[in-house]
Amino acid sequence: MTSDLDTRLDLLRNITSKVGAFALARFGNLSHIVIETKGEADYVSAADRDAESLARRLIHAQFPADAIVGEEQLGDAEVDHWLIDPIDGTANFLSGIPLWAVSIAFVRNKEPVLGAVALPALDTLLWASVDGPLHGTGSVSPLVGAQPIAFGIGRNRTWPLAHRLEVEAAFEARGYHIVCLGSCAAALAMVAAGRLAGYVEHGTHLWDCAAGHVLCRAAGAPSSILFEADGKVAIIAAPQHLRVTAKADARSLSEKHIFDPGSDRISHRMESSAD
């Protein structure tokens, strides 16, 4: 990793931690937060905007010329840039559910190369460069040799229901328990930390998944981001014995694009590991 990326990774870790602490203070005082909507069942609050503004100020204090793209303020994504989701899992955050994340990545040559995800209500911070290693502190620090039986699905409204149900049924048929955490970044952090076997979501945004994608790659978990013409993406972080076929795309993502024809059921994999 180049020296400028080393510097940015240190900054990324510090900023994500600080923004997490900022958001956590507001999470403890939800009665004073005004909730707005950006679209159907798409919520935002002053906490989201203020957290993103803090991240922008902290980045520009050290790298004033760097471009920044955020969920709430957008920006120039055609050059190297920082990518911010100040509170991923806003519905959880506004409901007092502790499964939400601060997700910040750095993108070089249109590829996420650095990422950090804070789970402030779980006292957890994970960060990495895409080539590793994965670093972590707190209650969800990385596990080695884990064999999780839960698989995460992002139940995004733009993912065609028939395709999503097909994917869920396929994972269940292989012995996985399906969970939806309500935060793409939190779920990918759980994959990287060895708590979830994998994660799939269609119709999300790059700021939701870029940092988590980096964490998964750093942890050795295969992860792919598939782009659509409308700017949305699909994220697939799958176990080692699964893969994404070359014909997969975000719009038609379904079971046949994720599984090897001969991929083992989870029960077979776990039995083999116990031998």
UniProtKB/Swiss-Prot annotation:
Gene3D superfamilies membership: 3.40.190.80, Fructose-1,6-Bisphosphatase, subunit A, domain 1
Native species: Sinorhizobium fredii (strain NBRC 101917 / NGR234)
Family: Belongs to the inositol monophosphatase superfamily.
Transmembrane helix recorded as keyword: yes
Gene Ontology molecular-function annotations: inositol monophosphate 1-phosphatase activity; metal ion binding
Binding site for Mg(2+) 1: E71, D85, I87
Matches recorded under PANTHER family: INOSITOL MONOPHOSPHATASE, INOSITOL-1-MONOPHOSPHATASE-RELATED
Residues given in the record as Mg(2+) 2 binding sites: D85, D88, D208
GO BP annotations listed: inositol metabolic process; phosphatidylinositol phosphate biosynthetic process; signal transduction
Keywords, ordered alphabetically: Cell membrane, Hydrolase, Magnesium, Membrane, Metal-binding, Plasmid, Transmembrane, Transmembrane helix
Protein name listed in UniProt: Uncharacterized protein y4fL
Compartments, record wording: Cell membrane
Domain of life, source organism: Bacteria
GO cellular component, one term: plasma membrane
Binding site for substrate: E71, I87, D88, G89, T90, D208
